[in-house]
């Protein structure tokens, strides 16, 4: 198994506080599974494709994409990986699909 950082996350300060862009990690397994952990924001699609190419891969070679959470900087490039199985925590998916009247605090979701 090989683990390689394809895109390095970048935090930065705005007038609203600290924000940032996610790190994208490639996990190339010995059994021909190629897994991405998060896939970055749409604005870095070209850089992600170039990083995959440097690693000897194309988007079609990715078999799985693990999404840590559904923020724009973690899911923006999902359309590049239409052949991949998408893996996401059930609680994250259910939370994202709630109407505003059903939203819970982060503390409630943690327990």
Describe these PLM feature segments:
Residues 16, 78, 97-99:
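Short, well-ordered secondary-structure micro-motifs
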